[in-house]
Amino acid sequence: MNFKRMTDLDLSEKRVLIREDLNVPVKNGQITSDARLRAALPTIQAALAQGAAVMVCSHLGRPVEGEPKPEQSLAPVAAYLSDALGQEVKLLTDYLEGVEIAPGQVVLLENVRFNLGEKKNNAELAQKYAALCDVFVMDAFGTAHRAEASTEGAARYAKVAAAGPLLATELDALGRALQTPEKPMVAIVAGSKVSTKLDVLTSLSDICGQLIVGGGIANTFLAAAGFNVGKSLCENDLIDTAKAIAAKVSVPLPTDVVVADATEIDFADFLGSLAKAQAIVKKVEDIADNDMILDVGPDTAKAFAEILKTAKTILWNGPVGVFEVDQFGEGTKTLSLAIAESKGFSIAGGGDTLAAIDKYKVADKIGYISTGGGAFLEFVEGKTLPAVAVLLERA
């Protein structure tokens, strides 16, 4: 992908506006997870090191535009950045008509979603952001799939628009996995429903050699192959779709599964009741009417791990079982360790996937972990991300 990169620009004495994703959880004024802030720090530090006057902007939560509330303020983030950077980071609330700032200084602009027109990508608002700077740096991959005034709009109107290091790294990794993948490529797509991952499955079926499915998605594929799935989550109206995907790409199906008796499961306390349920390994042809499939079986996990061993590119989106409960997590554990041991390039994304990576402590063995959420999925689906498209356009 061809786009301007912040790291290639001379930022000395330039006014630089960096759009980061600093949307962190805040409880009683305290930041409860600083992962996104830690990820953004190197970009800010790199701009300061070049002698730029740095303005940072972000959204936080989902405020009503034009109605700022203290609990949705970026004040705790400004305090965090001051400590982390070792210099004062002022929070500016009134900045749209101009910001007084000197090279080597950094300020944080208050929650962009307090501004009327932010989410609708209002052109006048976007032009005001653009007028603040000599260089606009888009570094928030997690919001790149939304055309908003502080993302797509500011990039469109700024004198110079570039991708920050975080965004550039993400796009390079996604390009490597999806646009120029080294073959053989294997994708793991798991989740409760085929319907929510249909575009992902369809897109990946065009580029990968094997498509491993898990969770409720696998149940629909098992049903399409004529197996009884008992009381398992399954979308019968998408059986023909599953058949069409399986006709296009190799979809290795589970040969054994881990089930529980559905009559023992309290759906109001799903995970709690699963912790007490008996986990039984069964061949797929032996699934009974009351069985609920909650993981792939040991033989299947071993077979899938063998497939992953020979892959040169692996894309992982979704755990293959209810890994939050240990007796239904062995399949996900086996696959996560196989991905970690693979010599191929691996990329993983999606909230549940990140939780599994944390649980099985394989983060440092995955080639690239995307924090993009919805943006990651839309990129995998082959959709155009507005804030990326404008950077390509302006390159």
Swiss-Prot record:
The protein's organism comes out as Acinetobacter baylyi (strain ATCC 33305 / BD413 / ADP1)
What reaction does this catalyse?
(2R)-3-phosphoglycerate + ATP = (2R)-3-phospho-glyceroyl phosphate + ADP
Question: Quick one: which gene encodes this?
Answer: pgk
Where ATP binds, per the record, is at 197, 324, 350-353
User: Which keywords does this Swiss-Prot/TrEMBL entry list?
Assistant: ATP-binding, Cytoplasm, Glycolysis, Kinase, Nucleotide-binding, Transferase
| E.C. number | 2.7.2.3
Q: How does it assemble?
A: Monomer.
For this protein, the record's SUPFAM superfamilies field holds: Phosphoglycerate kinase
Q: Annotated pathway, please?
A: Carbohydrate degradation; glycolysis; pyruvate from D-glyceraldehyde 3-phosphate: step 2/5
Family classification: Belongs to the phosphoglycerate kinase family.
Q: What class of enzyme is it?
A: transferase
Q: What is its main location?
A: cytoplasm
**Gene3D superfamilies reported in the protein's UniProt record:** Phosphoglycerate kinase, N-terminal domain
Subcellular location as annotated: Cytoplasm
Q: Which GO terms describe its molecular function?
A: ADP binding; ATP binding; phosphoglycerate kinase activity
Q: What is the name attached to this protein's record?
A: Phosphoglycerate kinase
Q: Which HAMAP family match?
A: Phosphoglyc_kinase
Q: Which Pfam families match?
A: PGK
Which GO terms fall under biological process for this protein? Answer: gluconeogenesis; glycolytic process
A Gene Ontology cellular component where this protein is annotated is: cytosol
